[in-house]
């Protein structure tokens, strides 16, 4: 059973999320609702047998849920200043992951529609590549240049503004 009432409060209800590799994650409705995709499924009553997430592996889903749990708890906190400082500190350590996990977090946050996580991961990526050359970025993310020199030159001309210092 996916939606089990544990108390009178709807936030106490548990939702079962199922990763692409079949792992099951029981989370509160408040945590699950950080994802607009899952929130819509809850509203539509589509969570009875669990919510399959075919585009998110268990290791990535666990990381996303760590983020959702902290942010859902912070949303319920009363002291705004303390909450903001705690989240800022949490986010800084949370997003300090290897490039593969960062890439997977971006994909998962986009798929699950968790805007704040997507913003955090994209901003971190932007910070990582800021000031780097095209080749340094390729090396950092393991991107193979499959353009011919002519194609590359054409792209540079079309996007000249991006290559200005």
From Swiss-Prot:
GO terms for molecular function: cullin family protein binding. GO terms for cellular component: cytoplasm; nucleus. Disulfide bonds: none annotated. It comes from the Eukaryota. Gene3D superfamilies: Potassium Channel Kv1.1, Chain A (3.30.710.10). Pfam families: Skp1 (PF01466), Skp1_POZ (PF03931). It is found in: Nucleus. Residues 106-164 are annotated as: Interaction with the F-box domain of F-box proteins. Coiled coil: none annotated. GO terms for biological process: jasmonic acid mediated signaling pathway; protein ubiquitination; SCF-dependent proteasomal ubiquitin-dependent protein catabolic process. Transmembrane segments: none annotated. Its main location: nucleus. Pathway: Protein modification; protein ubiquitination. Keywords: Host-virus interaction, Nucleus, Ubl conjugation pathway. The keyword Nucleus applies. Belongs to the SKP1 family. Part of a SCF (SKP1-CUL1-F-box protein) E3 ubiquitin-protein ligase complex. Interacts with rice black streaked dwarf virus RBSDV protein P7-2. Is able to form the SCF complex together with CUL1 and the viral P7-2 protein. Interacts with D3. Involved in ubiquitination and subsequent proteasomal degradation of target proteins. Together with CUL1, a RING-box and a F-box protein, it forms a SCF E3 ubiquitin ligase complex. The functional specificity of this complex depends on the type of F-box protein. In the SCF complex, it serves as an adapter that links the F-box protein to CUL1. This is SKP1-like protein 5. It comes from Oryza sativa subsp. japonica (Rice). The lineage of its organism: Eukaryota, Viridiplantae, Streptophyta, Embryophyta, Tracheophyta.
